[in-house]
Amino acid sequence: MKWRIVVELAGADGAVQFHEISVGGAGTVDHSVEPLGLGLTLAEGKKTLAGLQRHLVQAQTEEHCRNRRRCQGCGAQRPLKDMRRRRLASLFGVVEVRAPRFGPCRCGVASRRTLTPAAEIMPDRCTPEYERTLAKMGALLPYRRARSLLEEFFPLGDTPQVETIRQRTMRVGARLERDAVAPPTSSPSSEAESITLAIDGGHVKSVRSYQVRSFEVFVAQVSNDAGKRVMFSSVPAEADRQQQQLRGVLHRLGATPRTPVTILSDGADGPRSLGEAASVGPTHHVLDCFHLSMRIQHVAQAARGWPDATPGDRAEAACLADAIEHIRWRLWHGQVQRALDLIGDTLVILDAAAKTASLHAASAGKVAGVLRGLETYVSGQSSLIIDYATARRNDEPISTATTESTVQRLLHRRMSANQQMRWSPRGAHLMLKVRTAVVNGTFNNDHTTAERWARRPFRHAA
């Protein structure tokens, strides 16, 4: 069977053009034909799409240039200054088109500048979908892996280099940030009854030229009472008006000056102060029960090393494990002072055992050191500890476990140490802007909205 694909292009003036896109042929389909010869191959499909894109873009560009040559003031034709070539990168190949430049009209009413119509429809020398796909692939995969996948499945012609993918991703991230700091133009569509802000931090290895070995990244998950969740990420050292960006996220979820905001954190000053400054309504800080339980778990692990050679040692180990469990129970129910009293009594016993010449003196000293660290942590965060048992029964947020998984999803899968990656704070910040938008499922819409913040090297023609 032989086949031929022809495209018919009908212009606004009624002119019709026919262009042959691709041809092919094979024998009749019978039992002797191999399955590989059935239908279009990937290479033939790429060739067909590339040919269709080439003729379509060239026809659209020529029609736009003809329409823009007519002066809007007097209706006369602008004089042709020169003729150039312009390349447009798209997902279906790189197309080279004729790009005429027109001088100012002799009437001098509409414009006194040179007009390049092709630059109006090709501002970034690529289609928005091409730039969006490159940025999305670069945010989800290592740049070299993204390049290989693009080369495998798209008829790109000239496959973009790794540096091109990186620059496109950074450029889109900068646009998203400029759009995020823009003040909201409207009030929330619906007011939220309550908002939960779970914020945590992670660390990314920095490039060798930076001052420190790693830098901190803030990752937050914001949710309202309707169940809508939005992720937020930022590098404090590079963020442009970080508080305003987070305030914009709260605004989109329905935050008003009357909406209470519950801030879940590990007690560190940085995340707490960021959430406090970004909230426009009343705030309530809660210590994440996950971090608190991990501190208690460290004490329990240290207590497992207690010697059990004699029945007396086993009895002491059982008493110690029982005391740790009681400390856990009291903290879980918000009884901070009772927990501190029990910690103090246990430390007295452990310190006395550490001063003896028995076999478990070393174990007692080790457990006492870890338990004393828990005492310091609980004392410093006592105002943030609540009755977690009651809060859980009332379906109130008590943990940042989902935010921990968000840190794993945003940071470690793309920027983790096992890939031997090192990042500059600025590069990591812009990368996270794109990656967060992709994870939130709003990247396509955000990319379109942020188009107004594109900084391009040419002036807008009249």
Segments the model singles out, each with a brief description of its role:
Residues 1-52, 99-462:
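Catalytic center-proximal scaffold of phosphoryl-transfer enzymes
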Residues 46-60, 82-92:
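Short Cys/His-rich Zn2+-coordinating modules
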Residues 60-70, 84, 97-101:
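Short metal-coordination and nucleic-acid-contact micro-motifs, chiefly zinc-binding Cys/His arrays
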Residues 63, 78-81, 278, 418:
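Amphipathic alpha-helical interaction segments
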Residues 71-74, 104-105:
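Short cysteine-rich clusters marking metal-coordination/redox-active sites
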Residues 75-78, 111:
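Cys/His-rich microdomains that often coordinate metals
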Residues 78, 95-97:
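Short, isolated positions in well-ordered beta-strands
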